[in-house]
Amino acid sequence: MIPTMTSAGWAPGVVQFREYQRRWLRGDVLAGLTVAAYLIPQAMAYATVAGLPPAAGLWASIAPLAIYALLGSSRQLSIGPESATALMTAAVLAPMAAGDLRRYAVLAATLGLLVGLICLLAGTARLGFLASLRSRPVLVGYMAGIALVMISSQLGTITGTSVEGNEFFSEVHSFATSVTRVHWPTFVLAMSVLALLTMLTRWAPRAPGPIIAVLAATMLVAVMSLDAKGIAIVGRIPSGLPTPGVPPVSVEDLRALIIPAAGIAIVTFTDGVLTARAFAARRGQEVNANAELRAVGACNIAAGLTHGFPVSSSSSRTALADVVGGRTQLYSLIALGLVVIVMVFASGLLAMFPIAALGALVVYAALRLIDLSEFRRLARFRRSELMLALATTAAVLGLGVFYGVLAAVALSILELLRRVAHPHDSVLGFVPGIAGMHDIDDYPQAKRVPGLVVYRYDAPLCFANAEDFRRRALTVVDQDPGQVEWFVLNAESNVEVDLTALDALDQLRTELLRRGIVFAMARVKQDLRESLRAASLLDKIGEDHIFMTLPTAVQAFRRR
């Protein structure tokens, strides 16, 4: 059995190498070779999405592969350039750099450093719970919005036209006005690459489709001299490895990048943890969210110091490694070795990659992000879930990638507050043949105890729902068909309380007392009891009206 890695200090990845089993080697080697073949063209493509030279994608890949293998808690996750962070990088930096390519590169590296520092500090502060900030509907809608923005950003690349604008609607409008100037050789090449990628995915899912498609396009361009006919190629790529260094940036630029870096950090971390948990669950492993924060932080710092840009997890590369048999992060180290070999000895081949082929690769990746089956699933489950997903997509398209991320987080929080502010509640009764007390709405045959209302409010009590709780509890009393003598609050769901909620509880007790109704509480856990004591409510309610179980509360009512 593979041991879980829930806690291994700052380097949980070391455990997998310390306990490495020889039978895993074949799968890890195959996964490393496959992921490297996938990563090289993908990293170059995402660098262009970020607004940087293709080589920057390779630079941003090297150090994170090694660092995550040691510091990450997932044995499957692949770290490197990815679509969402690349798009956000472009959205943040394009207005700041104003066409200055050198300044753009410096800002990109600085952004990576800031994202890394924020994640590292958050991990040290044990803020791993932030991984739950995005609900499923918001995540589905957000990824669909990101996909559409990715496609719009590549319209010029795959058609050979000049597309202006930095946002979805401006790019689509610009493309629509220049569609008659499509460079057909470029467009045909891009569509051919896209078709080949689609066929490989369907008929040979384990094959490294991106490198096969891009190499095929490169051979076609070289054999037919298509670059002389207007098909753009990557051009010269510096051979060798990047020299680490701190980007020379001003204090003003640092201030301007802090908030965008926080947004990218949230996306990077939440995407990584969600992906890592999904794949870890398949093998009965655990993922330490705080370790993931620290690992992703260190990876981004390293990417910034090696002239890269913010990096994140890749679900596609992770899935590929898992499918071909990768069992540990040794596959990432093997992929790293191949990337280094290519950069040192085969930069001339990379220079011949057609830009249109890289653009087609981005479009292909974007199309895979749009999960129509999930939209249908949301629609079947609850209409409000579907509307939340569509609203998130609209926010990304209308507000841009960065503010769309903030809107996505805000929508998740608002959805959470909506549920907390107006949760399910119930009046409990006895059901013949079933032990305990149950919701009378679920069991029409349930029998209530005359004169007794047993009420349950299914959420922690806090400022967001304090007034809702008080109002609905009184409504239950008002709607009772008989003369209410006792009101018992079943507090099993109300362990967490704040002072606002306890004030509302006291107001409810006071109003019931004014009506001649006894207020009591059942299933009161020790934490709640201590909170009641701290708020001076325990004495007001009375120890004789605080019960450990519902049966003892009902028995006390009957003995009154």
From Swiss-Prot:
In its keyword annotation, does this UniProt entry include GTP-binding?
no
Q: Which one of the record's GO molecular function terms can you name?
A: guanyl nucleotide binding
Question: How does the record say this protein sits in the membrane?
Answer: Multi-pass membrane protein
Induction is noted as: A possible member of the dormancy regulon. Induced in response to reduced oxygen tension (hypoxia). It is hoped that this regulon will give insight into the latent, or dormant phase of infection.
Q: Which residues form the STAS domain?
A: 442-557
Q: Has UniProt tagged this entry with the keyword Transmembrane? A: yes
Main subcellular localisation: membrane
A Pfam family that this protein carries is Sulfate_transp
- List every stretch annotated Required for sulfate transport in E.coli: 1-436
Matching PROSITE patterns, A to Z? ABC_TRANSPORTER_1, STAS
The family note in this entry says:
Belongs to the SLC26A/SulP transporter (TC 2.A.53) family.
Cited function: Expression in E.coli induces sulfate uptake during early- to mid-log phase growth. Uptake is maximal at pH 6.0, is sulfate-specific, requires E.coli CysA and the transmembrane segment but not the STAS domain of the protein.
Q: Name the PANTHER family on file.
A: SULFATE TRANSPORTER
Q: What is this protein called?
A: Probable sulfate transporter Rv1739c
